[in-house]
């Protein structure tokens, strides 16, 4: 049963069994007889630029804690990094209007500095916070951040239904966006909206910190209805 389980767990278990063999804890190689399926992913869901702007423009003066979550999340939507990299950022990462950082996840296989030009709205968000602080924002634990994102979207009426895969990865279900959003939604919002404008995986990867040729971009190649209409309108 161990080697037949599906999804990401299968990958981790195979790695663990390889490690046991290297450490000479076991010489049983029965796991090598089984294939390892790639994890199943659905089409990515993310905020449209209009939905992101609703958050940016929302009056949260009566809810200062949610206002901080909003600032972090919208800023995150404009830079597209992984949440672990976001939490490491300081003012020293900002140089001449660019955000510079080295993604921790890929630095061993591709040690490249990512440079992201900061959008005007991202710069305005930063102006609200102490330039002498240790970090860009007063971050909370990631779990708290994720819960705050969902509360924020619900508060602002971002309730569009999105299609996701269930926990087994085989059946699709419909959920309101505010029930399933997380810190990773900010990264997908950055990539998804860029991909609509310039469907060039390598160019976007240079901004998002993905490794060149990343399989993640396969998920963004489903052309939406608006892009289809634009293509048809180009036919004379």
What are these regions (language model features)?
Residues 1-12:
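Single conserved hydrophobic/aromatic residue that forms the stacking wall/gate
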Residues 39-67:
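Long, amphipathic, Lys/Arg-enriched alpha-helical "connector/arm" segment
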Residues 61-63, 131-135, 150-206, 210:
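Short, basic (Lys/Arg/His-rich) helix/loop patches that form interaction surfaces
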Residues 92-97, 199-219:
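Short, polar N-cap/turn motifs at the start of nucleic acid-interacting alpha helices
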């Amino acid at each position: 049963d161990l080697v037949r389980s599906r999804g990401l767990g299968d990958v981790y278990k195979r790695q663990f069994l390889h490690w046991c063999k290297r450490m000479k804890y076991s010489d049983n190689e029965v796991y090598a007889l089984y294939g390892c399926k790639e994890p199943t992913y659905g089409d990515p869901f993310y905020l449209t630029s209009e939905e992101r702007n609703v958050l940016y423009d929302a009056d949260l003066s009566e809810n200062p804690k949610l206002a901080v979550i909003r600032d972090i999340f919208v800023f995150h939507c404009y830079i597209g990094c992984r949440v672990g990299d976001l939490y490491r950022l300081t003012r020293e990462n900002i140089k001449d209007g660019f955000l510079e950082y080295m993604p921790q996840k890929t630095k061993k296989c591709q040690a490249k500095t990512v440079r992201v030009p900061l959008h005007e709205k991202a710069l305005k968000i930063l102006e609200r916070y102490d330039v002498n602080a240790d970090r860009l924002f007063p971050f909370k634990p990631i779990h708290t951040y994720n819960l705050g994102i969902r509360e924020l979207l619900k508060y602002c009426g971002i309730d569009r239904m999105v299609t996701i895969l269930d926990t087994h990865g085989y059946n699709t279900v419909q959920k309101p966006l505010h029930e399933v959003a997380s810190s990773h939604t900010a990264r997908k919002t950055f990539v998804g909206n860029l991909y609509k404008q310039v469907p060039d995986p390598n160019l976007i990867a240079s901004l998002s910190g993905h490794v060149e040729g990343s399989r993640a971009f396969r998920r963004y190649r489903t052309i939406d209805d608006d892009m289809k209409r634009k293509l048809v309108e180009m036919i004379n």
